[in-house]
Amino acid sequence: MDMVWIVLAVGAGACLALQASANGSLRGNLADPRYAAFFSICGTIVTAIVVMLFLRPSPPSLNAIRSAPWWNWIGGPLGALIVLAGAALTPKLGAAAFIAAMVGGQLFCSLLLDHFGFMNVPQQGLTLGRLTGAMMVFAGVVLVKYW
């Protein structure tokens, strides 16, 4: 079953590369990465509304919303920054280098989240194997950009 989840994650990664490239192109047409990010996020909102109207999930209780820790609510602002970064940086770095750098940043942050168990992530220590894998990814970032 893990393989299904991995394939879905790879598909999501492909979507990230497509999104960054589309937003970078839109930035060129609109001459401003902020507008490219704005219109991309508007598309996200419309898509989310259509999905919610179609699937009609039960709403969470007010108590569940109120009791959520503050860091549960940073996904939206962080998503906006990611979209803006894609629109601004993909035309400068190229799609592969931008995504490679994003993956490097994601991996570094993920290792910290895992090691310390932040944000309810299951705690997994930083092992030599995990550190070596991360270093190989960072080497890949350099290779993708410069070779």
Model feature map: region roles:
Residues 14, 18, 46, 77, ...:
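Hydrophobic/aromatic residues within the transmembrane alpha-helices of Major Facilitator Superfamily
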Residues 108-118:
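Transmembrane alpha-helical segments of integral membrane proteins
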Residues 1-11, 25-28, 45-73, 93, ...:
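Membrane-interface interhelical linkers
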Residues 28-32, 85-104, 118:
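Structural motif at transmembrane-helix junctions in multi-pass transporters
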Residues 1-34, 81, 85, 139:
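Glycine-/small-residue-enriched transmembrane alpha-helix faces in small-molecule transporters
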Residues 127-145:
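Hydrophobic transmembrane alpha-helices of multi-pass small-molecule transport proteins
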Residues 39, 101-102, 129-132:
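Hydrophobic core positions of alpha-helical segments in small-molecule transporters
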